Regions:
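C-terminal catalytic lobe of pepsin-like aspartyl proteases
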Residues: 67-69, 77-217
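Aspartyl protease catalytic domain
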Residues: 1-131
């Protein structure tokens, strides 16, 4: 917003821009299942700012979808598959509302009930006999996770810190589960060497199978 009365942006906000630059994005909008963005906020006084994790709901950023007068119960994000070599352009659709109009019906679906009580919209992922809180987030450009202690650690990239760079493409098997059970789905995915991929595909705007450490999310 660049309000001149507000002090300098805290570095833990401004440092995030490097990942937008890497992806060639002007900006990234993330849509999650929650009506309010219960993330990190700051309270500023004079020239100093400090983190404030107790911002009243009425002062939090409202999801633009939730603010609609109708068709506000969710979104459908539809994108085509990305080839292994990436692509220089990708187009999809963002449909507002689910089951509210003739053109936003779900014909094939796996429904995962998320954890609304903790205000994070999470469900459960089982990976290598461990259970982890997980989310679907349209603003996350990679698969964020940490390697369990009972699995060989994935090599972290030297050129792009925080991303994974295994010696060869690595397949990981997980199971996704709704809150309280009720619906389970096996989810296998692969992780590429991110450094090698970027060098070979410098103009790619959609990168399949990119992984990063969970600490970045």
């Amino acid at each position: 917003i660049n309000d001149p009365t507000i002090p300098a942006i805290p570095t833990d906000c401004s440092n995030q821009g490097a990942y937008n630059d890497l992806g060639g994005a002007k900006g990234i909008i993330g849509v999650n299942p929650l009506p309010y963005d219960n993330g990190s906020y700051y309270t500023c006084s004079g020239t100093s700012c400090s983190a404030n994790n107790n911002v009243a709901t009425a002062q939090q950023i409202v999801s633009p979808v939730y603010a609609f007068s109708s068709d506000n119960n969710g979104v459908i994000v539809s994108l085509p598959s990305v080839p292994s070599g990436g692509t220089t352009s990708l187009s999809g659709t963002l449909t507002f509302g689910i089951g509210t109009q003739s053109n936003n019906q779900l014909t094939a679906k796996n429904i995962f009930t998320s954890n609304g009580t903790e205000q994070d919209g999470s469900f459960t992922t089982t990976y290598s006999n461990g259970s982890y809180d997980s989310i679907f987030d349209t603003g996350s450009t990679e698969l964020f996770f940490d390697t369990p202690s009972n699995q060989p650690a994935l090599t972290v990239c030297s050129d792009n810190s925080g991303f994974y760079c295994p010696a060869s493409t690595t397949t990981i098997s997980t199971q996704l589960s709704s809150l309280g059970g009720g619906n389970n789905m096996n989810f296998d995915f692969s992780i590429i060497n991110f450094d090698n991929y970027i060098q070979a595909n410098p103009n790619s705007v959609a990168i399949p199978n990119a992984g990063a450490t969970g600490g970045q999310n």
